[in-house]
Amino acid sequence: SENNIISKLEDKTNDLEQLRKDIEEMLKDLMSKKELDWTDKEKMKQLLEKQKEIQEEWEKVQEEQKELQEFMENNELTSEELLKKQEQINKLFEEVIPDEMKKMMEELEKMLGEMPREKMQQMMQDLKNSNKELQEMMDRNLALLEQLKVEKDLNELIDKMNDLSEKLKNMNENNNDSLTSEDAKNQFDELSKELDSIMEKNKGLQ
């Protein structure tokens, strides 16, 4: 569901922010030393491990996003506009972790033991810049997903209101008391609350 994907994306964005701070610290250490010691290399290994974990988790979220898109494409109630937005999100997901970033990670891992300090410093700076871009793209994805969710919720709410209106119409025409006035009022109150909540979320996205 969108909620699940949004929650995971928020987690990954927070992880990336922390990783960028760790890389900043590492860069400061590298600038203050002429040579790297064993501790520096261990720190570097840990940073690379964290980076890999984030990338692997991201790829899992990407799979979930594809499944969500397939579900929406096969659902006849999904509007053309929502489908277009979903496709836009999917394209952004595919762009997030570029091949150059993966290659840079591999190179860093291979050369960790023998890389000169200056070269490592440059590569860490590149990694930091890539992570900044990655974070910005994740933020864009989050904004689009949240917007998509609000629009879907609103469409579902309109369907529920139409359904309730139809039931009331039938009740009046047929004198059918299967849906009492009290029931109708309660359902309408619930839908009004849902609408208020959706409009509040929408206001927060603008």
What are these regions (language model features)?
Residues 1-206:
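Feature detects intrinsically disordered, low-complexity acidic/polar segments
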